[in-house]
């Protein structure tokens, strides 16, 4: 299964491009799933989703099916066999998950004298959309689709979402470590010694279930069959900055980038001075992008002059090279180079394309390395061989970070 995350600058046409990519896959005879958190009217504006008129599974209503992430075939008036569109209802997802958790925590709430909240009292909290998408990605990863296209928010929020499974799993391991669960037979004794109730078994079981589900999503994000497609409208300095920021974030968190789409490109050679100048700025920006992104394809999508109203509009908008699911451009892996024989050190090589020294910060804490690049930060567990070493320095050259480690004689096995 191929997975393509579509993101980019705000207002650049991400949803239109994601829908067109999904449609192109369905036209090739693939089984395609399109995931989006965009409102129903925004999806309907792409010409594929039929809004309330989209048929739903028998016995299910539109709200329930969307909130639960049940696939809604985009057929009927749209007439696109093989294409399934799921619009996530993050509000319904939040209420359902909150009530489920509250039910499981009933004993603890009774102990505190709390009055449980009812469904009608709940309103969606910030961040609910991200968790709804994580649950939808887990379900998609367990499906049998040939292609999954995910319509993500603008690039900063998108990269934060892709990094979320790893971050949440780290929090769970720190707050509810498996070692404490293993000592559950001693929990009554520990509770008496501490003078406070110990966490209930259901809490550890819930944490274990969350960790397993997050691991599935993390595996999907880190899969070699997963890539990111960036969408931007050239011509403004802001678009160029956003793409450079995206490159930094994807270099640190992944997945690999497979294509940059320059959207809404005007025809060249216009007799109108204003349009000619705007087209010239677009072409200059595209040239800069191709130089900056190296071997990553930069495909142009022409300005249609109107919003797409039906699938045929998307067919005309997206040509074969832009609509294909090309393989992501290979990136160097994170490797440990053994240079003890020459320099007495081990070197951890971390590719960070687009990174510059004044935006880079490194901090080692115990068995982890905190890497900050621009607005992004990732906490990396050290490979086991480096945990017995001390950091002696680091350098950034040509988009690759090299961190030098000196083996600690007191910890390093003798004879090695």
Report each predicted region and the residues it spans:
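Short, charged/polar, Gly/Pro-enriched secondary-structure boundary elements
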Residues: 92, 169, 409-413
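Conserved nucleotide-binding/hydrolysis micro-motifs of P-loop NTPases
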Residues: 39-42, 90-94, 154-157, 177, ...
């Amino acid at each position: 299964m191929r997975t393509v995350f579509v993101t980019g600058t705000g207002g650049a046409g991400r949803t239109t491009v994601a829908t067109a990519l999904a449609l192109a896959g369905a036209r090739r005879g693939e089984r395609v799933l399109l995931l989006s958190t965009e409102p129903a009217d925004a999806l309907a504006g792409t010409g594929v989703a039929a809004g309330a008129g989209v048929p739903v599974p028998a016995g299910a209503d539109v709200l329930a099916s969307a909130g639960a992430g049940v696939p809604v075939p985009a057929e009927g008036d749209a007439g696109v066999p093989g294409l399934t569109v799921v619009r996530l209802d993050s509000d319904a997802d939040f209420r359902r998950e909150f009530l489920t958790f509250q039910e499981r925590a009933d004993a603890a709430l009774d102990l505190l004298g709390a009055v449980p909240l009812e469904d009608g009292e709940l309103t969606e909290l910030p961040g609910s959309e991200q968790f709804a998408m994580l649950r939808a990605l887990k379900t998609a990863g367990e499906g049998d689709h040939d292609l999954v296209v995910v319509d993500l928010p603008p690039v900063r929020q998108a990269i934060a979402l892709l990094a979320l499974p790893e971050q949440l799993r780290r929090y769970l391991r720190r707050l509810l470590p498996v070692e404490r669960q293993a000592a559950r037979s001693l929990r009554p004794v520990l509770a008496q010694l501490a003078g406070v109730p110990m966490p209930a078994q259901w809490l550890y079981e819930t944490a274990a279930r969350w960790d397993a589900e997050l691991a599935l999503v993390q595996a999907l994000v880190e899969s070699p069959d997963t890539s990111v497609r960036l969408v931007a409208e050239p011509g403004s300095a802001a678009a160029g900055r956003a793409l450079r920021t995206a490159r930094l974030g994807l270099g640190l968190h992944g997945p690999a980038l497979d294509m940059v789409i320059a959207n809404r490109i005007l025809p060249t050679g216009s007799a109108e001075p204003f349009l000619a100048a705007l087209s010239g700025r677009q072409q200059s920006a595209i040239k800069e992008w191709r130089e900056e992104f190296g071997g990553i394809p930069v495909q142009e999508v022409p300005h249609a002059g109107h919003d797409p109203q039906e699938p045929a509009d998307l067919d005309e908008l997206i040509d074969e090279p832009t609509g294909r699911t090309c393989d992501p451009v290979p990136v160097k892996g994170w490797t440990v180079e053994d240079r003890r024989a020459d320099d007495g050190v081990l070197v951890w090589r971390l590719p960070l394309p687009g990174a510059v020294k004044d935006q880079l910060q490194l901090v080692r804490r115990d068995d982890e390395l905190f890497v900050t690049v621009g607005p992004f930060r990732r906490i990396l567990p050290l490979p086991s061989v480096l945990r017995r070493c001390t950091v002696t320095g680091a350098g950034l050259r040509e988009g690759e970070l090299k961190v030098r480690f000196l083996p600690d004689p007191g910890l390093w096995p003798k004879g090695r």
